[in-house]
Design a protein with these regions (language model features):
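Helical element adjacent to the flavin cofactor pocket in flavoenzyme catalytic cores
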Residues: 141-200
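Dinucleotide-binding Rossmann-like beta1-alpha1 core, especially the glycine-rich loop
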Residues: 49-128, 252-254, 292-293
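Glycine-rich FAD pyrophosphate-binding loop
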Residues: 24-45
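Beta1/beta-strand and adjacent pyrophosphate-binding region of the FAD-binding site
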Residues: 2-15, 32
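Central helical "cap/lid" subdomain
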Residues: 41, 195-242
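Active-site lid/adjacent beta-loop-alpha segment flanking the redox-cofactor pocket in flavoenzymes
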Residues: 220, 235-331
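C-terminal catalytic lobe of FAD-dependent flavoproteins
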Residues: 291-386
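Short beta-strand to alpha-helix junction loop
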Residues: 63-66, 93-102, 141-160, 170, ...
Length: 386
C-alpha cells in the first residue's frame, strides 16, 4: 500500500514533534510524523536531564539558544498547554586558571548577543548554592535565564499542537528507507513496515538512528552515539533548595534538584567509544560518579541512590548540529547531531526547519550548520558540552 504526504518527519522526540507542529502550522500541507516506538519521546528526549541554557561558547549556539529559550519559557502562555519548568539558572564552576579566560570570553560573547550572564567569584557561587564546595574555584558564570523543563511535557505538547494543526502522528511505525528519484537528485518518499509514503519532503530527525536512515539515500552523516549516565538520589539534609543546574567544568559533573533529592551525571571516558549500549555501569557510578558528586556537594554523601539510566547523545566532530537541506538531494532536510542539546533547541529548530521548507526567511541563519561544512573543513567547535 502506498500513501502520500507533503512532508514526512522521521523521529518522535522533542525535535520531531516540534518540526511536525511548525510544518503543519506553516501550511506545509499534509504532514506525517513517524515514530518507531509505541510512544513519543522514549529515546534521547525521555532520558535527558531537561536543561535549557543560553551559555554556549559558539555564536550560532548562543543565537539558537536565545530564540529557543524564549519559546520554551513562553510555551504555556502562547499555546495554553501546561509545561513544568523552573528558571533557576545554570552555574558553571571553573577550578582551573588556564580555563577561566575561555569561560569569560564565552560569557562576553553571550552578553554581546543579548544574554544575561554574570561572572561570579567563589564566595558568590557558594552564596547562590549553599553547601557547594568551592575550594579551588577561580570563577563561575551564571545564566539566570537558563533552567529546566519537562521533556515529556514539551514533546507531547508539540504533538498535541501538531495534531490540532492537521498533522498525522503514526506510532510504532519506523521509516526503513528514504527513496530518491531515478537520477538521485531528489527524495520521493519513505518506506515503512506498513507500506511506502510518497512525499517530496522528508525531514530526518531520527536522533542517534539518523545515520543509518540517511545512508539509505546515499547521505553520510558524521554522527556517532555517546552514552551518558544519569542518576537520581533520595532526599538528604542539605539538599539545595534552588533548582539551579550546577556544572563543575573540571569533569563536567552536573547536578540539579529533582524531587526530594538531586539528579546528576557526568561524562564517562569509556563512552567516547561509539556504542548504542544503554546498560548502567554500577561500578563506575560507585567508584567515579559518586565520589565526584561528594566532592562538589558534600551533603550528597548522606543520600541514597533512587534511579539510574543511560541515554545517548548524537555527537558530531565539532559538537554542533547538522541542520538544513542537503546539496544535490532536493527535499531532504536534516535536524541531527545536536551533541547533547537537542531537547533545548527543539522549539527553534522546528520553527527554522518549517521556514526552510516553506521558503520563509529563517529566524536564525543556520547556513553554517549545513552538512557540507565537514567536507569543506569548516568545523565550528563548542566547549560547553555537558
Amino acid at each position: 500500500m502506498t500513501d502520500t504526504a507533503d512532508a514526512v518527519v522521521v523521529g518522535g522526540g522533542a525535535m520531531g514533534a516540534s518540526i511536525a507542529y511548525h510544518l503543519a502550522a506553516a501550511g506545509a500541507g499534509r504532514v506525517v510524523l513517524l515514530e518507531r516506538e509505541a510512544a513519543l519521546g522514549t529515546g534521547s528526549t525521555g532520558r535527558c536531564a531537561g536543561g535549557f541554557r543560553i551559555q554556549f561558547s559558539s555564536e550560532i549556539n548562543v543565537r539558537l539558544s536565545l530564540a529557543s529559550v524564549a519559546l520554551i519559557r513562553g510555551f504555556e502562555a502562547e499555546h495554553g498547554l501546561p509545561l513544568d519548568l523552573d528558571v533557576d539558572g545554570y552555574l558553571f564552576l571553573v577550578r582551573d586558571d588556564a580555563s577561566w579566560p575561555g569561560y569569560r570570553a564565552a560569557a562576553a560573547t553571550q552578553r554581546s548577543l543579548g544574554a544575561r550572564v554574570e561572572e561570579l567569584d567563589a564566595a558568590a557561587a557558594e552564596a547562590l548554592i549553599p553547601g557547594l564546595n568551592v575550594d579551588g574555584v577561580v570563577g563561575a558564570t551564571f545564566g539566570p535565564d537558563d533552567g529546566i523543563a519537562d521533556p515529556s511535557g514539551l514533546t507531547n505538547g508539540y504533538a498535541t499542537l501538531a495534531r490540532r494543526a492537521g498533522a498525522q502522528i503514526r506510532l510504532g511505525t519506523a521509516a526503513t528507507r528514504i527513496w530518491t528519484s531515478p537520477d538521485g537528485g531528489r527524495v520521493t518518499g519513505v518506506s515503512t513496515p506498513d507500506g511506502d509514503i510518497d512525499a517530496p519532503v522528508v525531514v530526518n530527525a531520527a536522533g542517534v538512528w539518523a545515520t543509518a536512515l540517511a545512508a539509505t539515500c546515499g547521505v553520510e552523516l558524521p554522527i556517532h552515539p555517546e552514552p551518558r549516565h544519569v542518576v537520581t538520589t533520595s532526599g538528604f539534609p542539605g539538599r539545595p533548595e534552588r533548582r539551579t543546574l550546577v556544572i563543575d567544568t573540571a569533569t563536567m559533573f552536573y547536578f540539579h534538584r529533582e524531587g526530594a533529592g538531586v539528579l546528576m551525571g557526568m561524562p564517562r571516558l569509556a563512552d567516547a567509544v561509539a556504542t548504542f549500549e544503554t546498560v548502567v555501569d554500577d561500578r563506575w557510578v560507585a567508584e567515579e560518579l559518586l565520589p565526584q558528586a561528594v566532592r562538589v556537594l558534600p551533603a550528597i554523601e548522606d543520600a541514597g541512590l533512587a534511579r539510574s539510566w543511560v541515554g545517548l547523545y548524537e555527537m558530531t566532530p565539532d559538537r554542533h548540529a547538522i541542520l538544513g537541506p542537503v546539496d544535490g538531494l532536493a527535499g531532504l532536510y536534516l535536524a541531527n547531531g545536536f551533541s547533547g542539546h537537542g531537547f533545548q533547541h527543539a522549539p527553534i529548530v522546528g520553527k527554522i526547519t518549517a521556514e526552510l521548507v516553506t521558503g520563509a526567511p529563517p529566524t536564525v541563519d543556520v547556513s553554517s550548520l549545513r552538512l557540507e561544512r565537514f567536507a569543506r573543513g569548516e568545523l565550528i567547535g563548542e566547549s560547553h558540552v555537558v
